[in-house]
């Protein structure tokens, strides 16, 4: 079982969610999860996420939504118009401390879930891994370089599938300038 985007699913309950994943793993369950290193999420405005009650469920307002095509913050009127039109929004809804808690956790991997890149798109489309190395390793010291590389490469998945040990199997190689 893989739980996607634990940070944007759990929000302020990230600590509880991380402990639940850790407890399940300690009991031998094959469960993984990932976080992305941004305080904003991104999705299509026409999705069911924005059905009636979305403001109460997420604890945000129209102004916390940013229309990707123009960069503008939404109002009740522009929300209705753009929702009918269809398109992508950036959702400003997470606190930096929630993100750092998720990134630091030994039970998480780093995921980007980047959408096809377009001007104004969520930065995770191109900058997720550089952000982890720059902000959480170099600047904040929240992770060691070794731990960060383990979180951003498919090493965990290769170990789980056994491909890291099989002769002739592909192995990830990351080359970068730090």
Residue ranges and their predicted role:
Residues 129, 152-153:
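N-terminal alpha-helical segment
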